[in-house]
């Protein structure tokens, strides 16, 4: 199942970022992105060596690469991307497209 992975850098103000992420952005992802099958998000706590280069990671799952591309190109997808850029005050988020390996 293809997924979009979004990595948010540490923001200028962690409290404001986390509040806006939970109260505005996460609901927007679920409500406005068509074809979304599953949404997972996590706060990054650090690395074994200390501080992490990211504050938060999100995974958005779709049935196919085509449905992922259609979702991001949609009006709801574009609004959600714009909002992600707005709240990511530590720099633009890193966006990756991936697919989970099949279990061995």
Descriptions of predicted regions:
Residues 1-104:
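Macromolecular interaction modules
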């Amino acid at each position: 199942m293809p997924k979009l992975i979004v990595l948010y850098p540490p923001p200028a103000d962690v409290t404001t970022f986390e509040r806006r992420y939970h109260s505005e952005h996460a609901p927007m992802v679920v409500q406005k992105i068509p074809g979304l099958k599953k949404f997972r998000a996590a706060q990054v706590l650090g690395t074994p060596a200390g501080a992490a280069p990211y504050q938060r990671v999100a995974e958005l799952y779709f049935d196919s690469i085509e449905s992922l591309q259609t979702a991001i190109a949609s009006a709801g997808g574009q609004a959600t991307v714009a909002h992600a850029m707005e709240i990511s005050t530590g720099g633009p988020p890193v966006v990756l497209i991936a697919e989970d390996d099949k279990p061995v």
